[in-house]
């Protein structure tokens, strides 16, 4: 019996230790569990689905908390569901990108990814299948990278289900995540998604990026950046072509309200798309979106509006938008652009250089600037075409002025336009507005050709007349009459600024005399001449009080110092000297002074 007792005691202790260890794994007093404690390997080969889901479910049973994911590559062969009140958290504390576009150990393979990486493989060829990760009420996905290792860089790429989606719950969050190459990234629209929160999300969605719909309480989206980094190292990538043909970065349906801040998409067919809600009742109709510092670049359609909420609509402010703005005839809501830069597209697919507007809603541009950045558009006649509805363009700038059809006729109002207000705008070129509208129209207060003909009321002056026999050399005459050495600036006269004698004046900063302006009048006959120099007024009170003027004549060299500050634009007498015939004499201005100096004109009067 004694011999049997010891083994039994040993086995009992082992069983107790195992039970205690299992209890330690299953319970956390700190609110944290780690997937490796549940058997996750993170080697990129072992299926870690069960370990992840066990950790998530155990955390939910304890009332919620954080399941951490150590650095590694975790193969998830099916999908995950993050329960209520649980956060799945990786190592990242900010959105990441690929460390290198290609892993040096596998140049033809995928990117080099570090941190907490989840490898998604389920659902190839089934875009309507189960999402890779479901979020429940008050659940969060944070600090992870998700990569599809079996995705192909083809046109089309392999279709997969959504990467992250809500189960139909409020308060779902995505923070500090990188979705490398999802076919469809985030679905907060197929099911209810009120008060969702997305911050610091990076990725290259191939077909659809972020879809929002069925949100009856304010959603918030911050710092989302979609760009083609996965294909950046592959010249002429077929995937990049697919994105420009089919890709939609942001799809916004029914939301009441939605705040969108610091978001960006580049190289998609549609950058930001507003659509009618997919459901009926309170979920019907368009959305109400406020977008700040949010835009799209290199897109066929940077903004596509199919429908917005009738009484609220959408508003862009302080945003840059590269690509066409298209408002369909299905839209009845407001679309506002305030303080935005609008640049058009290079693709010529939409029949306009910058915007095509229809529908029954009001589209307004206030304090914006329009600049068709691609000069080679050959097949478009207008910058902005308004087919129907309402348009307002106020206090804005049209930059284009070169000889192109869309520059010569920047705005077209077609007959079905109900109301148009185009006032107080500046056009660098022609301000031709073709008004065929049958509705009420106000076009007033616009100014045109401010770059091609900047001073239409100012006529270039004739050369001033002086005393009979006077010899005048102006700073605009050029050699051999005048030569400038060192650094000299030029201020030209305008219709409201006459600072110089004829066309303007040269000036130089105070210095050591290395800036020299040498005026050499052509004297027809030897004799005595009174020398004058012209000085303009002092607009900045920084002119010299001792500006030196050297007069070299047949009598030798003499220097006269002039106080420029009280002068109002006048000839200053420098003395009478004997000059030989020809260009043997000179009057020289230098910057060896206590302030800025002028060199404008010199006059010799005989007698």
Task: Give the location of each predicted region.
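Positively charged n-region of N-terminal signal peptides that target proteins for export
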Residues: 1-4
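Bacterial N-terminal signal peptides
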Residues: 7-17
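Bacterial Sec-dependent signal peptides at the C-terminal "C-region" and cleavage site
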Residues: 16-26
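Acidic Gly/Asp/Thr-rich repetitive segments characteristic of extracellular carbohydrate-active
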Residues: 35-70
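Extracellular beta-strand-rich solenoid/capping regions of secreted or surface-exposed proteins
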Residues: 53-61, 74-89, 93-142, 147-171, ...
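Short glycine/acidic-rich loop motifs that flank beta-strands on beta-rich extracellular proteins
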Residues: 64-65, 77-79, 97-100, 124, ...
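Feature marks extracellular polysaccharide-active and adherence modules
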Residues: 70, 77, 83, 89-91, ...
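Extracytoplasmic
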Residues: 456-607
